[in-house]
Amino acid sequence: SGSCEMKTCWKSMPTFGDIGQVLKEKFDGATEVQSLKIGSRQQLVPTQRDFKPHTSSDLVYLVPSPDFCEEDLKVSIPVGLTFSHPPNQGSLGTHGRRCNKTSKAIDGCELMCCGRGFNTHIEEVIERCSCKF
């Protein structure tokens, strides 16, 4: 009948939100590992024996993150297979920091205060304002 069929294929990137969701899931399921010499090769092995071995697409880490809620000035940064303690690094914690009571973002009191609760402080400021009408 003279009709023809044409098929076109292309690849497209997932949305930024989809990529973020995959990364968040990988972060939440990350496995702490240690570098061990097995035979003549260095291998990354889970620190917890009951954890399954990781795959090449899993997220792994050698050093746990500091507790950002509490002060933790001791940070170990892997350098090769040894660890160094650089000065002026770590976490000062969140005690005493100002937060936004109504925010659900990282500046919000619920998140920043790490479940410890927070004090509300109301301050009234009276200023002279050279207003002209």
UniProtKB/Swiss-Prot annotation:
Pfam families: wnt. InterPro entries: Wnt, Wnt_C. The keyword Disulfide bond applies. Keywords: Developmental protein, Disulfide bond, Extracellular matrix, Glycoprotein, Lipoprotein, Secreted, Wnt signaling pathway. The keyword Secreted applies. It is found in: Secreted, Extracellular space, Extracellular matrix. Disulfide bonds join 69-114, 99-109. Palmitoleoylation is required for efficient binding to frizzled receptors. Depalmitoleoylation leads to Wnt signaling pathway inhibition. SMART domains: WNT1. GO terms for cellular component: extracellular region. One of its GO terms (molecular function) is signaling receptor binding. It comes from the Eukaryota. Its main location: secreted. Coiled coil: none annotated. Belongs to the Wnt family. Ligand for members of the frizzled family of seven transmembrane receptors. Plays an important role in embryonic development. This is Protein Wnt-4.
